[in-house]
Amino acid sequence: MTVTVLFELRIKPDAVPAARDLMHRPLEVTRAFDGNLGIEVLVDADDEAHWMMYQLWDTVEHDEAYRSFRAGEGKVTELPPLLAAPPVKTRYVTSDI
């Protein structure tokens, strides 16, 4: 069953250009990761430092494997200093409603 993940980032306002430059490569890796069905980065129209990453995964297990990868060998170590707050991840399962 597919799952949708919303991953919210609050970037330090003065770090937005650096975050934009940084995220190109990690997003390429995410898009190529096994089980990823798509990812879009949404930027708040009123606050360019507020980003929402909309991710679609084939299964919960694919999402979990990706999270493990990002916590280990795929960690984006340059990102935390650019953040104004810790990221917030919310996972949704697709229902039959």
Where are the language model's segments positioned?
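Short, well-ordered beta-strand segments in beta-rich or mixed alpha/beta enzyme
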Residues: 4-9, 38-67
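Short, surface-exposed ligand-recognition loops at beta-strand->loop->(often short) alpha-helix junctions
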Residues: 10-19
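A broad, low-amplitude sensor of folded, mature protein cores
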Residues: 15-16, 30, 34-35, 44
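Short, low-order "capping/linker" segments at domain edges
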Residues: 93-97
